[in-house]
């Protein structure tokens, strides 16, 4: 998850945006006059959506993509804060509030902090991410948040959040079974329960993983976990 790009801008889309931006700059006065008239007629929402929100989202996505490249190269500090030519995730989150790119930037900022072992900061930004109704990204960010909770010593919250991440992943999966994400989150929750000497609760989770996620790589070693907490 940590090194997967969760938003990219296709070259064709970027070229189209560049052309639209150039057109807007050339005919700014005429367009703004027309926009003013449109605001009077329809209350401004269509104008905002088409001429401001759209290009703003494109700009935010472009800035995000550049920071993602740094993230993918393991340059977490630079991805977070940017450099002379690139806005980092913190700037994207701050400057493009309300866009999908800003939301993803908050998740990435949290992941950067996590990779730098700055767990309290990681919690702050991962909590600020607004989950969507998807099968992979939102559950993965929630799982990262659970890991951050564990590393700040909030074990109970980590356990419940790992379970939540698994539920989120399953809810959008075919047959409500996400073999890619859910088993690892549940196993993480169970191992934390073991650390609290709650073996019976951990056992129930391990049994669930064995029975429900039979096609998952994570379930291949599940018998040794079951044996350990059954002793």
Residue ranges, per PLM feature:
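Short solvent-exposed coil/turn linkers within tandem alpha-helical repeat scaffolds
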Residues: 54, 93-102, 116, 131-138, ...
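N-terminal positive-inside, membrane-proximal cytosolic segments immediately preceding the first
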Residues: 1-37
């Amino acid at each position: 998850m940590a090194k997967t790009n969760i938003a990219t801008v296709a070259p064709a889309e970027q070229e189209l945006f560049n052309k639209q931006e150039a057109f807007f700059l050339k005919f700014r006065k005429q367009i703004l006059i027309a926009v003013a008239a449109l605001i009077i007629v329809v209350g401004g929402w269509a104008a905002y959506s088409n001429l401001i929100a759209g290009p703003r989202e494109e700009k935010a996505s472009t800035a995000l993509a550049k920071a993602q490249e740094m993230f993918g190269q393991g340059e977490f500090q630079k991805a977070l804060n940017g450099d002379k030519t690139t806005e980092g995730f913190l700037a994207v989150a701050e400057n493009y509030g309300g866009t999908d790119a800003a939301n993803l930037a908050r998740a990435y900022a949290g992941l950067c902090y996590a990779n730098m072992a700055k767990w309290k900061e990681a919690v702050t930004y991962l909590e600020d991410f607004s989950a969507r109704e998807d099968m992979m990204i939102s559950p993965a960010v929630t799982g990262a948040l659970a890991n951050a909770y564990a590393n700040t010593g909030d074990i109970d919250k980590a356990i419940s959040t790992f379970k939540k991440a698994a539920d989120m992943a399953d809810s959008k999966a075919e047959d409500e079974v996400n073999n890619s994400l859910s088993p690892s989150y549940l196993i993480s929750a169970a191992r934390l329960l073991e650390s609290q000497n709650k073996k019976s609760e951990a056992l129930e989770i391990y049994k669930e993983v064995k029975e429900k996620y039979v096609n998952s790589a994570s379930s291949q070693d599940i018998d040794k976990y079951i044996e350990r907490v059954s002793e």
